[in-house]
A protein has these predicted regions:
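Residues forming the flavin
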Residues: 1-174
């Protein structure tokens, strides 16, 4: 796990080595790819404070909808009895544009669960998952809308990330 980057200020801030958690320093020739994963806010704050050039990027924000699996099966298979014993749990996908902005379902989990996914205390963040048999009585899907950097006031390059974090905390409080 990376603990810090060593930058060469004479070369325009290029990464010349990476310090890992146990204190070892690894020197690199060529580009360094940071595969941060989800909720790596500390990494982005570190890079920003180190003077790395960054720009704000859009995200998708929404809610997770939960439905009886039978209802989705009935709608998708056009059958009052649902899927029967031979068809798989039904899925759906919703995609549209509203005034040029994407609105869509995300990570539809047939016969699945809504699960907690917060990475910090006092946050509400959820995701969905389906067991391999997709056999629970509930299905769920994220329903999200595109949020663009220009939707959020200010010039802070990390403003979209800060908006996301504040939204997760607001959901906890309310």
């Amino acid at each position: 796990k990376m603990s810090s980057l060593v930058l060469d200020s004479d070369e325009g801030g290029w990464v010349v080595s990476v310090v890992i958690v146990n204190g070892l320093q690894k020197t690199f020739r060529g580009p360094v790819v940071l595969a941060t994963g989800h909720s790596a806010r500390d990494v982005y704050c570190y890079l920003f404070s180190a003077g790395i050039d960054m720009e704000a990027k859009g995200i998708a924000v929404g809610v997770r909808l939960e439905h009886p699996s039978l209802l989705i099966d009935q709608i998708q298979y056009h059958n009052k009895q649902g899927r029967g014993k031979y068809l798989p749990a039904a899925e759906y996908s919703f995609v549209t544009q509203v005034e040029g902005r994407g609105v869509y379902s995300f990570c539809m989990c047939p016969g699945g669960f809504v699960i907690p996914a917060a990475t910090d205390k006092e946050q509400i963040v959820v995701n969905g998952m389906s067991p391999c048999n997709r056999g629970t009585q509930w299905s769920n899907s994220g329903m999200v809308v595109e949020i663009r950097p220009e939707d959020i006031n200010g010039e802070d390059v990390l403003k979209v990330m800060r908006f996301q974090e504040q939204t997760e905390r607001d959901c906890w409080i309310n």
